[in-house]
């Protein structure tokens, strides 16, 4: 039942039943008016009017005793924290992703990304907890101006969910979370507002699906017959 949907995530999530997804992994707009070197921008990045409604819906559709991991803008952490807590989430962990490059330089060069681990209820502890400092491989931002690397997202999905779980990303961009879920043997629901990134995500997911099917076919081809 994996789906990659174009639309306003608040309106789309409002059509979902409550307690519908097993895990949320998302990278919402940071509320900083981002613009990259090519002039690409992020929808909703200049206003926080969507923030509380989106958090309320994420809490509602997430199953009880489950987790959400959300990236955030460090200089807008007060707004994100207030919205998460007002929605009902509790903070249970924090992740730092270390970069090997500087993405922007002001008073200091920015060489990390951060995400909070948020809980609805009392989720079970993972069997193999991840360290709270993880690596970050440059994605190239080919599909989206703030594209997150699949290699950083996939360990989170594999640690915090079981196979066939439903992973939701309401701010899916070009689908990195969905790709990570697909490669992990999980189902996904991605929601992206802008048509250009939704289209890029669809193409990307289709390519990954074809590659996985081809790999499975090759495995079958070389599989020895049972005695």
UniProtKB/Swiss-Prot annotation:
GO terms for molecular function: DNA binding; N-methyltransferase activity. Keywords: Methyltransferase, Plasmid, Transferase. Its EC number is 2.1.1.-. The keyword Cell wall biogenesis/degradation does not apply. It comes from the Bacteria. The keyword Lipoprotein does not apply. InterPro entries: DNA_methylase_N4/N6, DNA_methylase_N6_adenine_CS, RM_Methyltransferase, SAM-dependent_MTases_sf. One of its GO terms (biological process) is methylation. PANTHER family: RNA METHYLASE-RELATED, TRNA (GUANINE(10)-N2)-METHYLTRANSFERASE HOMOLOG. Belongs to the N(4)/N(6)-methyltransferase family. A putative beta subtype methylase whose recognition site is unknown. This is Putative methylase YubD. It comes from Escherichia coli (strain K12). The gene is yubD.
């Amino acid at each position: 039942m994996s789906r990659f949907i174009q639309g306003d995530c608040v309106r789309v999530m409002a059509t979902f039943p409550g307690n519908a997804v097993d895990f949320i992994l998302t990278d919402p707009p940071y509320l900083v008016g981002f613009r990259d070197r090519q002039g690409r921008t992020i929808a909703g990045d200049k206003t926080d009017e969507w923030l509380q409604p989106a958090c309320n819906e994420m809490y509602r559709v997430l199953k009880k005793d489950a987790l959400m991991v959300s990236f955030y803008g460090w200089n807008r952490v007060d707004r994100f924290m207030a919205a998460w807590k007002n929605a009902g989430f509790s903070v249970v962990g924090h992740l730092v992703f270390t970069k090997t490059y500087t993405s922007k330089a002001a008073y200091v060069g920015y060489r990390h990304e951060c995400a909070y681990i948020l809980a609805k209820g009392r989720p079970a502890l993972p069997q193999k907890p991840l360290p709270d400092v993880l690596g970050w491989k440059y994605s190239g931002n080919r599909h989206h101006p703030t594209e997150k690397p699949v290699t950083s997202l996939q360990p989170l999905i594999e640690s915090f969910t079981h196979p066939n779980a439903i992973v939701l990303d309401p701010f899916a961009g070009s689908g990195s979370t969905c790709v990570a879920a697909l490669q992990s043997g999980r189902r996904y629901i991605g929601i992206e507002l802008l048509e250009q990134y939704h289209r890029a995500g669809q193409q990307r997911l289709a390519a990954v699906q074809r590659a996985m099917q081809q790999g499975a076919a090759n495995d079958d081809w070389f599989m020895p017959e049972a005695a």
